[in-house]
Amino acid sequence: MSRSSQKTVGLGICGLGRAFTLMLPTFVGDNRFVLVAATTPNRETRDIFNKDFDAPSYPDLTALCTDPNVDAVYIASPHEFHFEHVEIAARAGKHILVEKPLAISLKEAQAIVDIVRDCGVHLIVGPSHSFDAPVLQARQMIASNEFGGLGMIQAMYYTDFLYRPRRPEELDTSRGGGVVFSQAAHQVDIIRLLGGGLIKSVRAHTGNWDEARSTEGAYNAQLAFEGG
């Protein structure tokens, strides 16, 4: 694929599943990006990418990261592989956009922070609802102090997430499955924006009540901010 004279970010895609299809309109609609390569284990899917985008595809991320046209990598692989794939991209000197969750353990998340700092690359985690217009408007109203100081945020959210068609790993907590990894990141992202600070403590409970889909299907959490 030829790169235009306009400065663009050559984006390599790691994972061509649902997350990628949701992000695709954004990528192709923004002339600051060009899709230059992809990787997925499925050969047939790689062939479709080659045809649709006139760009190469690779059987693994290590091979993709050798492509000189790749400036940054969008990681949309299953949750359990995020740590491995972030490390590969970072050590290859590629900037990274990774879908939430960042990792499936605190240890992995901290290791990712250390790795990207050591490698001198930028990393962004993918929750996006804090950019929704109503959320941004609410943040503006809070920041204006027109209605007084913020005392408490109550957020309630319900979907049929657990009962949609799911791959096996999406129903296995040890592999990053369940609503905490897949859904809670959105609510925490929004609440942190509205609260305008860092969280100092978390108290939480989870519910795992369906033996047929034995992962967390519900949760509640109380988050306390440093500023009170």
Label each residue range with its predicted role:
Residues 15-23, 65-73, 121:
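A broad helix-preferring feature
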